[in-house]
Amino acid sequence: MTFSKELREASRPIIDDIYNDGFIQDLLAGKLSNQAVRQYLRADASYLKEFTNIYAMLIPKMSSMEDVKFLVEQIEFMLEGEVEAHEVLADFINEPYEEIVKEKVWPPSGDHYIKHMYFNAFARENAAFTIAAMAPCPYVYAVIGKRAMEDPKLNKESVTSKWFQFYSTEMDELVDVFDQLMDRLTKHCSETEKKEIKENFLQSTIHERHFFNMAYINEKWEYGGNNNE
């Protein structure tokens, strides 16, 4: 078994939890609240901006121009391609996407997730540590998208079904390339290093769960009482 496959299989129970949580289940049914959609889109807009910055930080750590080209292409996709999925949700609540994301949010779960990735980008020379922190994002979306398209509970009459349809295919290439990078970059890693890399991957998968739930519960920073909000 390749190391990348080991990581993906280890994360499956967490992804099952994500799928069965309120955010995805309500989205499947086409009844996710407007508040949850807005919070998700606003937080994800901030998240994707940082995600592209981390891609850029990985470029000097790549040894081949092919890998550099891949990272540049992913930056372009994050800036333009993934907006398509966001606009599906904006259409669902009948609000312009650009108007929704004018209000910036930085909830605790998104903050912790981003800092997890930045720490590995700054502290680890081997890009495998950072990729392990980033790779669960497309993998989680790919698994959820594919599973939803086979789920009889999917409300195909709702525009939200297009969100699942998008992620059921659009993440495949990114997942494959991340797997190839992971296997190549960990080829000479010690077992201790591989254990840390695996923990990075699983921690980010948990961060993905918290991110969806953050939108579902309208998570905010609590500073202690109304006077500090």
Swiss-Prot record:
Binding site for substrate: D44, Y141, Y167
Active-site positions on this chain: C137, E208
Site (Increases nucleophilicity of active site Cys): residue numbering on this chain: Y47
Gene3D superfamilies xref list: Heme oxygenase-like
InterPro entries per the UniProt record, alphabetical: Haem_Oase-like_multi-hlx, Thiaminase-2/PQQC, Thiaminase_II, Thiamine_Salvage_TenA
GO cellular component term of the entry, any: cytosol
The UniProt record lists the keyword Hydrolase: yes
Entry GO MF terms: thiaminase activity
Listed pathway(s): Cofactor biosynthesis; thiamine diphosphate biosynthesis
Annotated catalysed reactions: 4-amino-5-aminomethyl-2-methylpyrimidine + H2O = 4-amino-5-hydroxymethyl-2-methylpyrimidine + NH4(+); thiamine + H2O = 5-(2-hydroxyethyl)-4-methylthiazole + 4-amino-5-hydroxymethyl-2-methylpyrimidine + H(+)
Protein family per UniProt: Belongs to the TenA family.
Function: Catalyzes an amino-pyrimidine hydrolysis reaction at the C5' of the pyrimidine moiety of thiamine compounds, a reaction that is part of a thiamine salvage pathway. Thus, catalyzes the conversion of 4-amino-5-aminomethyl-2-methylpyrimidine to 4-amino-5-hydroxymethyl-2-methylpyrimidine (HMP). Is also able to catalyze the hydrolytic cleavage of thiamine; however, this thiaminase activity may not be physiologically relevant. Therefore, is probably involved in the regeneration of the thiamine pyrimidine from thiamine degraded products present in the environment, rather than in thiamine degradation.
Self-association and partners: Homotetramer.
Protein known as: Aminopyrimidine aminohydrolase
Phylogenetic placement of the source organism: Bacteria, Bacillati, Bacillota, Bacilli, Bacillales
Gene name as annotated: tenA
